[in-house]
Design a protein with these regions (language model features):
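Sec-dependent signal peptide cleavage junction
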Residues: 24-32
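Beta-strand-enriched, solvent-exposed domains that form extended recognition/catalytic surfaces
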Residues: 31-139
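Aromatic-rich peripheral "rim/lid" segments of glycoside hydrolase catalytic domains that contact
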Residues: 242-244, 274, 290, 295, ...
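Noncatalytic carbohydrate-binding groove/subsite architecture in carbohydrate-active enzymes
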Residues: 262, 277-282, 306-447
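Bacterial N-terminal signal peptides
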Residues: 14-25
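Bacterial N-terminal signal peptides that target proteins for export
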Residues: 4-14
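N-terminal substrate-binding region of glycoside hydrolase catalytic domains
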Residues: 70-78, 82, 91, 113-271, ...
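Structural preference for beta-strand elements that scaffold enzyme active sites
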Residues: 150-152, 169-172, 216-220, 281-285, ...
């Protein structure tokens, strides 16, 4: 859950230093791009690249180079991986994939060059492999999505038996990379290197996935990256030495060590929970509320454009690792409820991050990424989201236009409408998968009680059910969190002692009962007066 956002300030010299670090991650072009890579795909044990256009080189040949996520330019390199074959107005390349070896090209992006003055000069756009799923050995399809069940919850494994009682089809669980890399006991060899993951964490995750699957729930893993001395190489270098102490950090794919460890970890998860005896995971969310970078995905104090481009590289590594094992897995980015609003510094508006991320993905090859977002009430403690909280009216934070500052359950359609634009469509031409990976309402605090919480869940779910582009919601949470209760938030369907609140029974029945008895809390007699069922 997002915390209180504090406005960040920094000195000019510090900003320049961070920008310098990030600029090293941007691709460098030494010539005009007169060649366009149209396709980059796996076929058998080869990577095939097809390009159009032409460029003048010293020898009339075209040379293909592979760049790892942590590499930014061809520079002085001479190790091209293929020579192009012009045919019928196009240029074709073929180079080995080297799957599951130290030379693997699974995470490479490719660029066409020509010889000039003894160097190889890029003359094309860059493109990653577009179909990593071509080598997948499994496919864990979502049963709940197929049946139209949108109900999910941020689960708590001691109460796993309640998932089927609630009728939820999705269960969310958070996975912290640092916890798995600290300690060992479970070995995994990937691309020629052996990694040892914390046996206790792995076995606990085995148990959680199996328990949730046994309750007929699809599992959604939220991947986060905390700091520890043993995993400092997985933390974005721009976030180190800043004196900040966020909950989670941006993943480091700017160095070989960081990128390879992240790829191996995501491969490990996707391979392990791929429908075998250890269970299956259908969805992965890469990072939590990444636009709230200062708290949840810290990369340093950098402009949003640089942040979004770097996040796209992290996502691409995770996506290719996951899809190369599980062709049916859904992989999501994650933003909070702030759309245009930001608190300055490294706290960005969600729309700006989405725009920058999408631009970078389109630049380097469109893939089937999805969006998860968190349309909480404004503020978080104001559970009756259908009203404006005292003192918030003059701020005008919520409206039903693309210029809204915040997204709540009342204007979720702003997001789904935005994603129907041509530039945001999936490679298939359809609207991308959109989910809500966190949403909750407190039963305590000013103006709140257990009936208000129950009404908020009923109303918000009916709005979600009426939106055909939202595939699922994870309500947060199953149980009141004692720490959050001290902060004035009691979002659980159960209280901290495990006793059901009215919200429990409402969520249990919300997809099969009118629940009109809760409509008066929002100012109507029946939900049909709001056009809802």
């Amino acid at each position: 859950m997002e915390g209180k956002r504090m406005k960040k300030k920094w000195g000019l010299s510090l900003l320049i230093a961070f920008v310098a670090v990030m600029m090293l991650q941007l691709p460098v072009s030494a010539a005009a791009q007169t060649v366009t890579i149209q396709l980059c795909y796996i076929e058998g044990d080869q990577v095939k690249v097809a390009a159009t256009g032409s460029a003048a080189g010293e020898d009339g040949q075209y040379y293909l180079f592979a760049l790892k996520p942590y590499e930014n330019e061809v520079g002085l390199r001479q190790d091209y991986c293929a020579v192009g074959t012009p045919a019928e107005g196009a240029i074709y390349f073929s180079t080995p994939l080297y799957l599951d070896t130290a030379a693997s090209q699974m995470y490479s992006r490719f660029v066409v060059t020509v010889r000039s003055g003894g160097l190889f000069v890029p003359v094309s756009n860059e493109m990653y492999i577009l179909n990593p799923e071509a080598v997948a050995t499994g496919a864990t399809y979502s049963i709940s999505e197929a049946t139209g069940n949108k109900k999910g919850i941020t689960a708590y494994w001691p109460y796993a038996n309640l998932l089927s009682d609630l009728g939820v089809g999705y269960a969310g669980t958070t996975i912290d990379t640092a916890a798995f890399f600290n300690g060992g006991g479970i070995n995994y060899t990937y691309n020629g290197k052996t990694y040892s993951f914390n046996a206790q964490e792995v076995k606990m995750t085995d148990t959680i996935v199996s328990l949730y699957n046994a309750q007929n729930a699809d599992v959604c893993m939220i991947i986060v990256n905390s700091y520890s001395a043993g995993t400092a190489d997985m933390v974005h270098p721009g976030a180190l030495g800043t004196g900040k102490n966020p909950h989670y950090y941006s993943v480091n794919v700017t160095t070989q060590a960081g990128e390879e460890k992240f790829a191996a970890f995501m491969s490990f998860l996707a391979n392990r929970y791929n429908g075998g005896k250890l269970g299956s995971v259908q969805s992965y969310v890469i990072g939590n509320e990444v636009n709230s970078s200062d708290s949840w995905h810290y990369a340093g104090e950098i402009p949003v454009e640089l942040f979004a481009a770097d996040y796209a590289r992290q996502f691409r590594v995770a996506y290719n690792a996951i899809k190369s094992h599980n062709s049916a897995a859904n992989v999501y980015i994650c933003t909070d409820q702030r759309w245009l609003h930001n608190d300055g510094g490294s706290s960005y508006g969600g729309k700006a991050v989405i725009d920058g991320f999408n631009a970078e993905i389109l630049r380097t090859g469109n893939i089937n990424w999805g969006l998860s977002f968190h349309p909480y009430a404004v503020p978080l403690t104001h559970s009756s989201f259908w009203t404006t909280a005292p003192g918030y009216g003059a701020l005008r934070l919520v409206d039903n236009t693309v210029n809204t500052k915040m997204i709540t359950p009342l204007n979720m359609n702003v997001v789904t409408d935005y994603f129907q634009q041509p530039q945001f469509l999936a490679p298939t031409g359809t609207v991308r998968n959109i989910v809500i990976s966190e949403l909750g309402f407190s039963s305590m605090g000013a103006g709140n009680d257990e009936n208000i919480q129950a009404a908020a869940i009923a109303y918000s779910y009916k709005l979600i059910a009426a939106n055909p582009y939202i595939k699922m919601v994870l309500y947060s949470a199953m149980l009141d969190n004692p720490v959050e209760v001290q902060q004035g938030l009691a979002n659980g369907l159960l209280n901290s002692a495990g006793a059901p609140k009215p919200a429990y029974y409402v969520y249990q029945a919300v997809d099969r009962d009118s629940l009109n008895q809760y409509a008066p809390f929002v100012g109507v007699s029946t939900w049909s007066q709001l056009g809802l069922q």
